[in-house]
C-alpha cells in the first residue's frame, strides 16, 4: 500500500475501463523517501505530471526522482489565460465575505471550464498512449 504521496490511487480501481497499473492519481509527492520513489517505480510509473500552476509549484516545490520523466502542465487556466489559481492565496483568515464569495465563484467557474480545450489534458491523453505508468497530481489529489 502506498501512503506517501497521500491520496494515492490506481484509477483502474475507480474506473474499470482504465487499464490497471497505467494511470495513477495523488496529492503532490513532496518529502518522499528513496523507498517511496522505489515503490512508485516498481509499480511501473515512469511519468510524473504536475497539474499545479507555476505559482503553486514555486510556493510548494519538490524534487522529482531522476528515474521519472517529470512534466509541469498547469490544468487550470481561467478564460483570461492567466495561470493564477492558488487557493491559499485567494482566501485568508482576513478575507471579507465578499472576497470569499468571489473566490468561490472563481473556483466554480474554473472547474466548469477546466475540462474543455485544456492543453494539459490533451498532453496527458497523448502520453496515455505510452505503455508506461503515469502519476498525475495537483496539490491535494482530490479534484
For each predicted feature, which ranges?
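Cys-dependent protein tyrosine phosphatase-like superfamily
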Residues: 1-135
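Cytochrome P450 heme-iron axial ligand motif
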Residues: 135, 140-143
Amino acid at each position: 500500500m502506498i501512503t506517501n504521496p497521500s491520496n494515492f490511487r490506481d484509477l483502474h480501481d475507480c474506473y474499470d475501463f482504465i487499464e490497471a497499473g497505467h494511470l495513477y492519481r495523488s496529492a503532490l509527492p513532496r518529502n518522499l523517501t528513496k523507498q517511496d520513489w522505489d515503490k512508485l517505480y516498481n509499480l511501473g510509473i515512469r511519468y510524473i505530471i504536475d497539474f499545479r500552476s507555476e505559482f503553486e509549484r514555486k510556493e510548494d516545490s519538490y524534487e522529482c526522482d531522476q528515474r521519472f520523466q517529470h512534466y509541469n502542465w498547469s490544468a487550470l487556466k481561467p478564460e483570461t489565460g492567466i495561470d493564477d489559481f492558488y487557493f491559499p492565496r485567494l482566501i485568508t483568515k482576513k478575507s471579507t465575505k465578499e472576497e470569499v464569495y468571489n473566490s468561490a465563484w472563481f473556483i466554480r467557474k474554473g472547474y466548469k471550464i477546466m475540462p474543455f480545450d485544456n492543453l494539459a489534458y490533451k498532453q496527458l491523453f497523448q502520453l496515455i498512449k505510452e505503455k508506461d505508468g503515469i502519476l498525475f497530481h495537483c496539490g491535494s489529489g482530490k479534484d
